[in-house]
From Swiss-Prot:
Family membership: Belongs to the PqqA family.
HAMAP family xref list: PQQ_syn_PqqA
Pathway the protein takes part in: Cofactor biosynthesis; pyrroloquinoline quinone biosynthesis
Descriptive protein name: Coenzyme PQQ synthesis protein A
InterPro entries, A to Z: PQQ_synth_PqqA
Keywords noted in UniProt: PQQ biosynthesis
Lineage of the organism: Bacteria, Pseudomonadati, Pseudomonadota, Gammaproteobacteria, Pseudomonadales
A single BP term in Gene Ontology: pyrroloquinoline quinone biosynthetic process
Organism: Pseudomonas syringae pv. tomato (strain ATCC BAA-871 / DC3000)
């Protein structure tokens, strides 16, 4: 993904946090 957007960054961070908690 080369396009950068604040909303996309928030979504990506939230997704990574969700995956982090889901893999625990």
């Amino acid at each position: 993904m080369s396009w950068t957007k604040p909303a996309y960054t928030d979504l990506r961070i939230g997704f990574e946090v969700t995956m982090y908690f889901a893999s625990r």
